[in-house]
Amino acid sequence: MCGIVGVVGNRNATDILMQGLEKLEYRGYDSAGIFVANANQTNLIKSVGRIADLRAKIGIDVAGSTGIGHTRWATHGQSTEDNAHPHTSQTGRFVLVHNGVIENYLHIKTEFLAGHDFKGQTDTEIAVHLIGKFVEEDKLSVLEAFKKSLSIIEGSYAFALMDSQATDTIYVAKNKSPLLIGLGEGYNMVCSDAMAMIRETSEFMEIHDKELVILTKDKVTVTDYDGKELIRDSYTAELDLSDIGKGTYPFYMLKEIDEQPTVMRQLISTYADETGNVQVDPAIITSIQEADRLYILAAGTSYHAGFATKNMLEQLTDTPVELGVASEWGYHMPLLSKKPMFILLSQSGETADSRQVLVKANAMGIPSLTVTNVPGSTLSREATYTMLIHAGPEIAVASTKAYTAQIAALAFLAKAVGEANGKQEALDFNLVHELSLVAQSIEATLSEKDLVAEKVQALLATTRNAFYIGRGNDYYVAMEAALKLKEISYIQCEGFAAGELKHGTISLIEEDTPVIALISSSQLVASHTRGNIQEVAARGAHVLTVVEEGLDREGDDIIVNKVHPFLAPIAMVIPTQLIAYYASLQRGLDVDKPRNLAKAVTVE
């Protein structure tokens, strides 16, 4: 959700900014802009639309060694060039890019900026005018003006500030919004995440909330808001350029769907030794053993992954599990058990809603585990423990491999705790073998892409509405499948417990309504779900079945290899990912960048 990139030093700033913004496209945006400066000139260029639209406006004379760039996802004000970043102060001297939400921007505007002229309607423009006022009207130094502004501003922010009269410095600050420093020889960078800087550096420095950074080409100075200098160690990122390219794929989403067998095998090599023994941090196991209830907090796809693992976690750990929507728990935390433990699922590790819950958990002394794809992310730093899902960069906005990797990672956790408790079911659960079979099942499904595309064309070519139904874990997969179809095909789709159809939803079924039924786990589940299929078919529904091998009948549409019931959500979700992909593709939509959506939701 928005992206920042900046560079100061001995590099071509325009090229670096544009390449960086392209790497940040996956975060979601509706406009973009750059500010580039050298000793002789400055250039501010903004555009509504894609990065390609911005690139088309940049002339060959736009050059410099220092600059800041931004992709904007509208929160205050519509998507216009005036509202696009970077924003300038009243005189144009100061230039600012910002991710986050300034909560008291109206108070700042009326209290400090009477008589100022504003070009747009953003909270960011208020912030840069405030900085400019303190320098040009109140005669503070740039650094003191920045600090004073930060003491007034309330909310979440990641700021990168430049002074057009001293273009050899970038001022940076953050609070509740992700930001990284990239380190180079003769240049330094700032960015929302490492993805945008990986072509230029693999050395990074984390900055924490309410810290201020001064970047020059040769030095990075980190202080708190009182000016006390802080020592920050750097680290080397494990990203590879080949991981963030599409290769021969038309869309990242298809590439990431295809990578899931590899991800399963990577998790095996990470969380099991050569003899198949599960290896999970003993401190995490002990913490779960000491808890009397586990609370899984997440949003979107990660929330659905939590549901898909609930039954497995309870059966193998003998600990009750509750699911919570992070955005709701941030405002109203329900009555908790006496010894709770929180598990936060987040692909990016930056989800603002989940972080809000984590801050409360930390204040209450509740132990927490973050399960994430991004080492060094905010949630991984602030939680008590972290498990990485090792899915590799996920660029497409619609999550696929992170969902299946979260389920697999939690399977290792559940088995490890169960074994530590001496639970026979956990001891008998040969996870390495079973997950290897899951990888094979995924590969078998992926070999049937043409069949799925054909089924989608017949089922979803013109529809505006669709339904997924299932029972047990299939219901949880149905919720994720419906979200995926909504996200990238814009088909209104809902996932329902099949047994709930007769309690209201069946009134929506009419001639040719698409209903996709998921069937796995047991003959009992299959029998009852097929009864529901007959109910909707009798009302004219166009039914497509996704059925686990051994439960299939003649006439079923997509057959999925049988896997262990705990891991069935992984195998069963793969056809639904392909269904969403082909539905979007056949409608001529941008599969990787659906409208109005962001990959990492970093504001509440």
Curated annotation (Swiss-Prot):
Biological process, per Gene Ontology: carbohydrate metabolic process; fructose 6-phosphate metabolic process; protein N-linked glycosylation; UDP-N-acetylglucosamine metabolic process
Lineage: Bacteria, Bacillati, Bacillota, Bacilli, Lactobacillales
Keywords: Aminotransferase, Cytoplasm, Glutamine amidotransferase, Repeat, Transferase
Gene that encodes it: glmS
Function: Catalyzes the first step in hexosamine metabolism, converting fructose-6P into glucosamine-6P using glutamine as a nitrogen source.
Catalytic activity, EC: 2.6.1.16
Residue ranges occupied by any Glutamine amidotransferase type-2 domain in the UniProt entry: 2-218
Presence of keyword Transferase: yes
Name the UniProt record assigns to this protein: Glutamine--fructose-6-phosphate aminotransferase [isomerizing]
SUPFAM superfamilies, alphabetized: N-terminal nucleophile aminohydrolases (Ntn hydrolases), SIS domain
Keyword Transferase found: yes
Subcellular location: Cytoplasm
SIS domain boundaries: 284-423, 456-594
Source organism (scientific name): Streptococcus pyogenes serotype M1
Catalyzed reaction equations: D-fructose 6-phosphate + L-glutamine = D-glucosamine 6-phosphate + L-glutamate
GO MF entry, a single one: carbohydrate derivative binding
Active site: C2 (nucleophile), K599 (for fru-6p isomerization activity)
PANTHER family: GLUCOSAMINE--FRUCTOSE-6-PHOSPHATE AMINOTRANSFERASE, ISOMERIZING, GLUTAMINE--FRUCTOSE-6-PHOSPHATE TRANSAMINASE (ISOMERIZING)
